[in-house]
Every structure is written in structure tokens, then in C-alpha cells.
């Protein structure tokens, strides 16, 4: 009809993108994914005092297939990481992730083997929110900033995962593979930290991850010795310097039985000083 000759190029396409992004920004449905104390502040944000429904987010969906925003509120344990990734993969595209609190963003005070040191090791994060825990006003400010990012972003959302590995975001982790502890070749190890590798039990001799946290050449998953070296822990815990390690045949077996405890008590009584008496009830 000659309409394209009267309008500058790209006007209709730009209008469609803006309309689509405006619709997505105005109707974000978060997934119910509270993990720790930050979830209390997230629930307060949805209550009447702050009224998150003003921004079109009054519905927290219990099904990830009906949500497009994941608010990770709290620390993520190593056992929760595969579940988090599975829920993220079940969310339809386009989708966004908001890391709420320092525990979800970087591990926070939980710098140990049981906590993932940042949820960005598992899923791509679009907005980081500091605080321990952040107040509802801070969460609403982060959501508004995310709205602005969505409005200015492409209509196709973020870059999709590609088989060639050109995407800057982690690839999906197979939950069954991660729980089974299979070799590292069947996992995406580009972004696995040391704690993540311990969680997925990458065996000795497997390819070393190249992501952040990959410091040791080999991760040995064998069980530790029964007794730590006395030079390190002996004096602090009262272990004699000449203490001998436990029998290897029993070090990894079941704990001591009642008979073993009784034998140890008899041995201690026989080694007591002469003339020592014990009160009996």
C-alpha cells in the first residue's frame, strides 16, 4: 500500500519491541523461591504496606512454568543448586533472575563447603541486591531497575544458550548427572568453583575447570584420614603427640559398638594409678 515509503525505516519494528518489553515489564510474575531469612523481607514486600502489586507483580507463582522472574532470596546450599537450576530451566523464555542478599550473591558469611559462593555459578543473574537482609524498599528499587533494563533490552530477551558455547551464561546442568557424581566431561565446568566441584564430586584426573575458583590441578575425592596430624590439631584438641591413627580397616566402617566402649573403659581403669578408687552408684 506504499506505507513503508512514507515512514522512516525501523519505526514499526521499534514500536513492536517497545510494546512487547513494556508488557513484560508491567506483568512480571515471580517464582516462589525463598531460601532463607531474605524471604521474610520478600514476603513483606508483597504485603499491604509496600504493595508490590502496584508494579504488576501481585502473583507469586508456585509453578516455574508460569513465572518469568526468579528472586533467589537467601543462601544456596550445594544440594539445592541442582534443584535451583532445574526450576530455572523450567521457566519459559524470556526470564530474569534477581539475586537478593549477599548470601545469594557471593555466599555472604557462609564461606564454607556447604554453600554455593554466588548463585551466578548456577544461573545467569540480571540484578544483584546487597544487604543482610535487604529491606523491602531495597528490593522494590532493584525490581524497578530491572524493569528499566527489560524496557531497554531486545525483544528476544537475553542471548539464548547455544551448542557452540558462545553464550556468556552457564549452560543447563543435568540434575541426574550432577547427583550421580559422573565425570566432569558430562557437566559444564566452565563456571564451577572449588565448592561446586566438591558438590559434583569431580574425580581425580578429570579435566580441570577453567572458570573462577579453579586453583588445584586435581580434586581428590577420597575420604580424609581418620585422625588429623598431631602437629596441626594434636595440642589444640588434647591428642597426645604419639597418638596413632585408627585401624584403616575400621576407619571408614561403622562407629564403635557398646563392647568397644566397654573395653576402652576397662583399659582406662587398668591404667589408672594404684590405689585409685571409683565411686559406684
Swiss-Prot record:
Signal sequence residues: none
The segment annotated Disordered runs over 242-281
Using the UniProt record, give the first listed, main subcellular location. membrane
Q: How is the cofactor bound?
A: Binds 1 [4Fe-4S] cluster.
Residues that, per the record, bind [4Fe-4S] cluster: 37-38, 103, 132
Query: From the UniProt record, which GO molecular function terms apply?
Result: 4 iron, 4 sulfur cluster binding; iron ion binding; NADH dehydrogenase (ubiquinone) activity; NADH:ubiquinone reductase (non-electrogenic) activity; quinone binding
Which residue spans adopt a coiled-coil conformation according to this UniProt entry?
none
Q: Which HAMAP family match?
A: NDH1_NuoB
Against NCBIfam families, the record matches this protein to: nuoB_fam (TIGR01957), PRK06411.1 (NF005012)
Name this protein carries in UniProt:
NADH-quinone oxidoreductase subunit B
Traced from the root, the source organism's taxonomic lineage reads: Bacteria, Bacillati, Actinomycetota, Actinomycetes, Frankiales
Q: Gene of origin? A: nuoB
